[in-house]
Amino acid sequence: MAQPSNYWKQDLLPLSILILTLVATECTIGIIASGIITVVNAVSWVQKRAVSITTRILLLLSVSRIGLQSIILIEMTSSIFNFSSYNSVLYRVSRVSFVFLNYCSLWFAALLSFFHFVKIANFSYPLFFKLKWRISELMPWLLWLSVFISFSSSMFFCNHKYTVYNNISLSSNICNFTMELYVAEANVVNVAFLFSFGILPPLTMFIATATLLIFSLRRHTLHMRNGDADSRNPRVEAHKQAIKETSCFLFLYILYAAVLFLSTSNIADASLFWSSVLRISLPVYPAGHSVLLIQSNPGLKRTWKQLLSQIHLHLQSRY
């Protein structure tokens, strides 16, 4: 996790190993899920010799998440075992890459939500009808614009210098070890504001489109219920499932934005418990969202089940 605020160097490692194990598990699940999305959509692209808007967004989203979760895992490992210092070129590259891929991932997820909202929602406004008509033409430009915004925003972190020093030691009764906390001499408020400012536009887009889509689906579901005595209508059930999935996406997205803000603001650094919780929570969204995307897509879900079946058979043959 390439944070500009701090890293850990531990005298004793029990809690560190536990945190690293949990983070590695989350990142591995996320990388595998994103890899499945990438492979399935890439194969579909090659076979059809054409790429749909949804396929294009999913490809960009999954590739950005593979890179993001790889950086989170590498940075977590290096910070715990002190493989590299904060002043190294490697850390600067890692930090900028983390910010860029984070912004890209957030933008692509927001644009996917926006595209689904325009295609699925039903609102009787002339502007909305015009947007629905032109959305396929606009999306490629919006994707390129989001990449440009992400790259430009991440460059602000390229030349930001940090002077690291041994500041304090925190003692914890958990596992009986002492943790040395290294704090960067930087204007943390400015760093947190700058990073959060880049998160705000895609966060606003995602919340707005997901909320409006849920509202539209619920309204349509009530309309179908009133017109059909059969409460187990497949269309009603499909709408209910879409509402649940969108609600889960929205919850994970907001949770991730909150974790990013708290991580960059150093609010939780004085507490060993909350600092550990933030580190463990960071990979939850990219992994969880990718798994939910697979579960909501029949083709991806089938590939996911086949992979799990192969892993299960392999483990049975070994043990």
UniProtKB/Swiss-Prot annotation:
Membrane topology field: Multi-pass membrane protein
Gene3D superfamilies: Rhodopsin 7-helix transmembrane proteins
Glycosylation sites: 82, 167, 176
Organism domain of life: Eukaryota
Transmembrane segments: 17-37, 57-77, 98-118, 138-158, 188-208, 248-268, 274-294
UniProt-listed InterPro entries: GPCR_Rhodpsn_7TM (IPR017452), TAS2R (IPR007960)
Main location: membrane
PANTHER family with a match to the protein in the record: TASTE RECEPTOR TYPE 2 (PTHR11394), TASTE RECEPTOR TYPE 2 MEMBER 39 (PTHR11394:SF142)
Additional remarks: Several bitter taste receptors are expressed in a single taste receptor cell.
Function as written in the Swiss-Prot or TrEMBL entry: Putative taste receptor which may play a role in the perception of bitterness.
Name of the protein in question: Taste receptor type 2 member 39
